[in-house]
Amino acid sequence: MSEKSRSDTSATASLSDSSKSPSSYSTPGTTTQKIIFPDGKLTKCLAFSAFVITLASFQFGYHIGCVNAPGGLITEWIIGSHKDLFDKELSRENADLAWSVAVSVFAVGGMIGGLSSGWLADKVGRRGALFYNNLLALAAAALMGLAKSVGAYPMVILGRLIIGLNCGFSSALVPMFLTEISPNNLRGMLGSLHQLLVTIAILVSQIFGLPHLLGTGDRWPLIFAFTVVPAVLQLALLMLCPESPKYTMAVRGQRNEAESALKKLRDTEDVSTEIEAMQEEATAAGVQEKPKMGDMFKGALLWPMSIAIMMMLAQQLSGINVAMFYSTVIFRGAGLTGNEPFYATIGMGAVNVIMTLISVWLVDHPKFGRRSLLLAGLTGMFVSTLLLVGALTIQNSGGDKWASYSAIGFVLLFVISFATGPGAIPWFFVSEIFDSSARGNANSIAVMVNWAANLLVGLTFLPINNLMQQYSFFIFSGFLAFFIFYTWKFVPETKGKSIEQIQAEFEKRK
């Protein structure tokens, strides 16, 4: 028998044998056994792998922002396309509805992709799942990029659904993959890169949409065609990245391959301490069957799953996508004219990138933790919404120019607060509180909830805003007040802690 075969057989046997002894797991996906993973450094291979993995995050952010600027142009094109396709006139109202469907179906695809991501990640691996996910991106790029040439607007709608599937997969896969390849002391920093690339991509898409770049009647298809670039780049580079060693050990039972991948990521031959910790976690996870979707809401998994869902709801029900999607409308309401709202929106995107970059550093800083940054961010957003309502009320009643400028400042404060913690932390927080056996399903459920809340806010905000005007932001104030209390009362600190230590915190906070 070869050395490789003996190693893999040994790892698999240890998983099998462990089921014959008393379990250190009371429920699948949880452990009472203390497993400590060592700290490490940012190596060239780890940095390269993180860059390649987060190209999928860029795709996610790009398609959040790329529909804003060309919306009016595409609506006009839909009217002409409908006439050519069906030889019938389409009213402006129905053209607006068709474009709204194209925008909203992105979130529907995201929900489906997010819910399916755990199955795909466990079936073909984290790296394999990203590979197949890029095929969806290429199909979507072809549909949306060629729609104008073909003259068929349903291609845009179908393309948005497919790219939504792609982004749903990546919004679960990327944080999970980053968390699994990171050393203990860099989990937060590398996990935050997902949100950083999302914010960078939103900014890039906003810049591309400017009228003197791609935001014209002839060039808007190029905005969607750009989807090909990160997809092809990731496809070309993925094979140079090691597979997740935790996945390879826990799901495939291949210790030899896991050790080889870990040596590349850590740039050292001595990975014995970390590989033994992975073996212990894999052995513990193998004691009982891998938890199914329904098991995630039972026993010891119920409490962490509930908190993971609440963290995703806190992110979306904070109103951040209202600030992002309708920022131009908000800035016009605050008194900006001409092209000023568009440039203000780009400025807001730049602030979001800068603050997210700072949060990447803060999240693993000795003086801060996940919980403290979440509380600080949610509190800042709560205060910002109250102040924004006050400024808009004064401005709408004929107040001085200072009220308009104050409203803009409060929107920026809102975005800064979001980037401090609620923007990045929920994405990798889910992977920190579950072991390898439950991580895929936990991410699937949490990401599906995130996308569902995204869709809910997107569909309901404009009707509510038409009814309540600036006072509609009080709804988000209420949500934020609740999530501040919930985070303070129930959410544990996870920085630098093992799964066992985190689960002990869960028990304290029940």
From Swiss-Prot:
- Tell me the compartments it is located in: Cell membrane
In residue numbers, the region (Disordered) covers 1-29
| Tissue distribution of the protein | Isoform a is expressed in pharyngeal muscle and intestinal cells in both embryos and adults (at protein level).
- The gene behind this protein is fgt-1
Residue positions annotated to bind D-glucose are: 195, 315-316, 321, 352, 427
Tell me the organism's taxonomic lineage.
Answer: Eukaryota, Metazoa, Ecdysozoa, Nematoda, Chromadorea
Q: Which family does it belong to?
A: Belongs to the major facilitator superfamily. Sugar transporter (TC 2.A.1.1) family. Glucose transporter subfamily.
Keyword Membrane assigned to the entry: answer is yes
Q: Tell me the function of this protein.
A: Facilitative glucose transporter that plays a role in glucose metabolism and regulation of longevity. May also play a role in lipid metabolism. Glucose transport activity of isoform a is competitively inhibited by mannose, galactose and fructose, suggesting ability to transport also other hexose sugars.
Question: What effect does gene inactivation have here?
Answer: RNAi-mediated knockdown of the protein causes reduced 2-deoxy-D-glucose uptake, glucose oxidation and glucose conversion to triglyceride; simultaneous knockout of daf-2 or age-1 causes further reductions. The lifespan in low glucose environment is extended by 20-25% after knockdown, with 7% extension in daf-2 mutant background and no significant extension in age-1 mutant background. Fat accumulation in intestinal cells is increased. Brood size and dauer formation are not affected.
Gene Ontology terms for molecular function = hexose transmembrane transporter activity
Protein name per UniProt: Facilitated glucose transporter protein 1
Single Gene Ontology BP annotation: monosaccharide transmembrane transport
